[in-house]
């Protein structure tokens, strides 16, 4: 498989880690910023809100931009947002950083999939996209537990600092490995929105919404639940997160 796919996989690993790692760091963040666990949990909501807002805007508003330039620019937004989170002096700045870092989420996955599929022959496109998204799966298995452990042992700011560094590494990797790719001149907002006329698209969206919604009701507060209900230590919580993921 082309090396560019591994650059994209590194990006999905970084994005997946920053999306979910907050759930394991809620007690640490709440204690450090002197806010309640429920209020801290809104940092997860803020990220999700940024994804919902950013995905269509970033995707539809950038169809005219060279795809290599776009992917690197999206990772720059990611680095900025996580950098703000790492150095946030208060809750408001941390929330702002979370929202900023989430704006590129959907666009990176969407554009990355198109770019990844275009790197290989048609018969290998499914495998190429799977390789790219393997970074997301690995982020849940390794990135989130490791980020939780680092955050609980050395401070949650370090976790976001390292995630920001991963984003920077991804941007550099893409800049050297990926060739310029012209945007689709036939693609436009009207053409992109036409997909919403399909009932199956809405069914898929509903399935995702209700399925993940049910999971995240509990998953968002899994660390404080385990900490208060079972008395588990930070290391034990990290192990539980690894097993669950």
Task: Set out the residue ranges of the language-model regions.
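Helix-loop-helix hairpin linking two adjacent transmembrane segments in secondary transporters
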Residues: 93, 122-124, 130-176
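Juxtamembrane intracellular "pre-TM" segments in multi-pass secondary transporters
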Residues: 177-205
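Cytoplasmic helix-loop-helix junction between adjacent transmembrane helices
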Residues: 97-135
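Extracytoplasmic
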Residues: 7-37, 218-223
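Short hydrophobic/small-residue motifs within alpha-helical transmembrane segments
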Residues: 47-49, 137-138, 245
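Short hydrophobic/alpha-helical segments at membrane-entry points of transmembrane helices
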Residues: 92-98, 203-204
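Extracytoplasmic gate region of multi-pass secondary transporters
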Residues: 202-241
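Conserved MFS/SLC helix-loop-helix module at the cytosolic interface between two early adjacent transmembrane helices
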Residues: 53-92
């Amino acid at each position: 498989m082309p090396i560019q796919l591994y650059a994209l996989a590194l990006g999905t690993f970084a994005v997946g880690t920053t999306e979910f790692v907050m759930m394991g760091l809620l007690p640490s963040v709440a204690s450090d910023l002197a806010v309640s666990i429920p209020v801290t949990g809104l940092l997860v909501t803020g990220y999700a809100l940024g994804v919902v807002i950013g995905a269509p805007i970033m995707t539809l508003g950038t169809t005219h931009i060279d795809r290599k330039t776009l992917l690197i620019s999206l990772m720059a937004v990611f680095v900025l947002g996580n950098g703000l989170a790492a150095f946030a002096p208060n809750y408001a700045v941390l929330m702002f950083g979370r929202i900023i870092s989430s704006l590129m989420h959907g666009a990176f996955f969407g554009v990355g999939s198109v770019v990844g599929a275009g790197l290989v022959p048609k018969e290998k496109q499914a495998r190429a996209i799977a390789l790219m998204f393997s970074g997301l799966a690995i982020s849940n298995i390794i990135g989130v537990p490791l980020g939780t452990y680092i955050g609980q042992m050395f401070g949650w700011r370090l976790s976001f600092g390292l995630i920001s560094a991963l984003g920077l590494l991804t941007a550099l990797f893409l800049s050297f490995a990926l060739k310029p790719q012209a945007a689709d001149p036939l693609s436009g907002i009207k053409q992109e929105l036409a997909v919403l006329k399909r009932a199956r698209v809405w069914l898929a969206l509903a399935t995702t919404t209700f399925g993940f919604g049910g999971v995240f009701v509990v998953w968002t507060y899994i660390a404080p639940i385990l900490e208060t209900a079972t008395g588990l230590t930070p290391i034990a919580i990290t192990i539980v997160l690894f097993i669950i993921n």
